[in-house]
UniProtKB/Swiss-Prot annotation:
GO molecular function: rRNA binding; structural constituent of ribosome; tRNA binding
Domain of life: Bacteria
InterPro entries tied to this protein: Ribosomal_uS7, Ribosomal_uS7_bac/org-type, Ribosomal_uS7_CS, Ribosomal_uS7_dom, Ribosomal_uS7_dom_sf
Gene Ontology, cellular component aspect: small ribosomal subunit
Protein name per the record: Small ribosomal subunit protein uS7
Purpose of the protein: One of the primary rRNA binding proteins, it binds directly to 16S rRNA where it nucleates assembly of the head domain of the 30S subunit. Is located at the subunit interface close to the decoding center, probably blocks exit of the E-site tRNA.
Assembly and binders: Part of the 30S ribosomal subunit. Contacts proteins S9 and S11.
Gene name, Swiss-Prot/TrEMBL: rpsG
Length: 156
C-alpha cells in the first residue's frame, strides 16, 4: 500500500458542442496518443451519422446506449485456502460508467465498418436499441455473476 497522499480526481471539462461531461469523458477515452481533435472529429462525425440514420437526437441515443450497457454486477477473483473463487460484487457507479464507455469503444473498434465514425455510430445505435456486442458483454458479465452467486458470502 502506498504511503503517498491520495491524488485528487481531476474534474472533466464539459465538451464544447453539447456542454456535457459524459460526452467529454467518452471523447477522452476515445482519444489515442493525445490526439483530441481527431477524437472529436470521429465522435461528432458519429453523432451526425446517428442523426441521419435514426432521425433522433444523437445525445439521447448516446445516453441511452451508455445506460443500457452499464453493468450492475461483476465477478472478482478472491483466493481462499488455495482456491480462487469468482466472487460476485456490485459495481460502483463510477466504474459502471467507465466500463460502459470502455466496452462501447472497444467493440466499436473491432467492428467491420470502414471508418471509425461509422463503427462508433453503429455500435451506439445498436446499444441504445438493446442489441449488439456491447450488450452481449454486459449480459455475459451478469450471467457470470449469477452463476457464481454461491460464493457471494466471500464478498469483502
Amino acid at each position: 500500500m502506498s504511503r503517498r497522499r491520495e491524488v485528487p480526481k481531476r474534474e472533466v471539462i464539459p465538451d464544447a458542442r453539447y456542454n456535457d461531461k459524459l460526452v467529454a469523458k467518452f471523447m477522452n477515452c476515445l482519444m489515442v496518443d493525445g490526439k483530441k481533435s481527431l477524437a472529436e472529429r470521429v465522435f461528432y462525425g458519429a453523432f451526425d451519422l446517428i442523426e441521419q440514420r435514426t432521425k433522433e437526437d444523437p445525445i439521447k441515443v448516446f445516453k441511452e446506449a451508455v445506460d443500457n450497457v452499464r453493468p450492475t454486477l461483476e465477478v472478482r477473483s478472491r483466493r481462499v485456502g488455495g482456491a480462487n473463487y469468482q466472487v460476485p460484487v456490485e459495481v460502483r457507479p463510477v466504474r459502471r460508467q467507465t466500463l460502459a464507455i470502455r466496452w462501447l469503444i472497444g467493440y466499436a473498434r473491432s467492428r467491420g465498418e470502414k471508418t471509425m465514425r461509422e463503427r462508433l455510430a453503429a455500435e451506439l445505435i445498436e446499444a441504445s436499441q438493446g442489441r449488439g456486442a456491447t450488450i452481449k458483454k454486459r449480459d455475459d458479465t451478469h450471467r457470470m455473476a449469477e452463476a457464481n452467486k454461491v460464493f457471494a458470502h466471500y464478498r469483502w
